[in-house]
Swiss-Prot record:
SUPFAM superfamilies assigned to the protein according to its UniProt record, in alphabetical order: Translation initiation factor IF3, C-terminal domain, Translation initiation factor IF3, N-terminal domain
Pfam families on file: IF3_C, IF3_N
GO cellular component: cytosol; membrane
UniProt GO molecular function: ribosome binding; translation initiation factor activity
Name under which the protein is recorded: Translation initiation factor IF-3
Keyword Protein biosynthesis: yes
GO terms, biological process: ribosome disassembly
Domain of life of the source: Bacteria
InterPro entries: T_IF-3_C_sf, T_IF-3_N_sf, Translation_initiation_fac_3, Translation_initiation_fac_3_C, Translation_initiation_fac_3_N
Assigned keywords, A-Z: Cytoplasm, Initiation factor, Protein biosynthesis
Subunit and interaction comment: Monomer.
Functional description taken from the UniProt entry: IF-3 binds to the 30S ribosomal subunit and shifts the equilibrium between 70S ribosomes and their 50S and 30S subunits in favor of the free subunits, thus enhancing the availability of 30S subunits on which protein synthesis initiation begins.
Species whose genome carries this gene: Pseudomonas putida (strain W619)
Length: 183
C-alpha cells in the first residue's frame, strides 16, 4: 500500500491577511487609500469603496472590535514587505570567531605579526580566539603561556575586551576576545 503525501515547500508561507470577500466581519473600521479614517462601515460599503478605487480591501487588525481594514493595492503591499525583509537581512552582520595560534616560545617578530592580525579581526567586528599549544615538556612551564596571554590581553585592551579568560583545555591554553562596541 502506498501513502500519498503532499509536496511541501521548505519555506512556510506566512499567514496572509484576509482580503476583499474573504473578510468575515459584518462591520469594519475603514481606513481609506490615502490613510484617512473613514469610520465604521458595513463590509458591503467597504468593498464598494475599494472597488471604486480599483484597489483591495485588506484586513489589517483582526483582533480589534470591529476589525480594522484598509483600502490598498495588496500586491504592492506584499512586494514592499518582502523588500523590507530582504533589506533587513542584508544589513545583518555575521560575527565570526577567528583563531590565532601561539606557542610558548613565539619570538617578538612573529608576535607582532599575529598581534597585527588580531587587531584587524577585532576592528572588522569579529571575535578573536587565541590558543597557545604546549608540546612535550613545555607543559611544565604553563606560567610562560599565561604571561604571553596576559601580554596579548594588555596589547589588545583598546581594541577589545576579554570574553573568556585564559583556561586550559587539554594541552592548549585558550582565551577569547570580543571587539569593543562602537559608539
Amino acid at each position: 500500500m502506498t501513502i500519498k503525501r503532499e509536496m511541501r515547500n521548505d519555506k512556510r508561507a506566512a499567514p496572509k491577511a484576509p482580503i476583499n470577500e474573504n473578510i468575515s466581519a459584518r462591520e469594519v473600521r475603514l481606513i481609506g487609500a490615502d490613510g484617512e479614517q473613514v469610520g465604521i462601515v458595513s463590509i458591503d460599503e467597504a468593498l464598494r469603496i475599494a472597488d471604486e478605487a480599483k484597489l483591495d480591501l485588506v484586513e489589517i487588525s483582526a483582533d480589534a472590535v470591529p476589525p480594522v481594514c484598509k483600502v490598498m493595492d495588496y500586491g504592492k503591499h506584499l512586494f514592499e514587505k518582502k523588500k523590507q525583509a530582504n533589506e533587513a537581512k542584508k544589513n545583518q552582520k555575521q560575527i565570526q570567531i577567528k583563531e590565532i595560534k601561539f606557542r610558548p616560545g613565539t619570538e617578538d617578530g612573529d608576535y607582532q605579526v599575529k598581534l597585527r592580525n588580531l587587531v584587524r579581526f577585532l576592528t572588522d567586528g569579529d571575535k578573536a580566539k587565541i590558543s597557545l599549544r604546549f608540546r612535550g615538556r613545555e607543559m611544565a612551564h604553563q606560567e610562560l603561556g599565561m604571561e604571553l596571554l596576559k601580554r596579548v590581553e594588555a596589547d589588545l585592551a583598546e581594541y577589545g575586551t576579554v570574553e573568556q579568560h585564559p583556561k586550559m583545555e587539554g594541552r592548549q591554553l585558550m582565551m577569547v576576545i570580543a571587539p569593543k562596541k562602537k559608539k
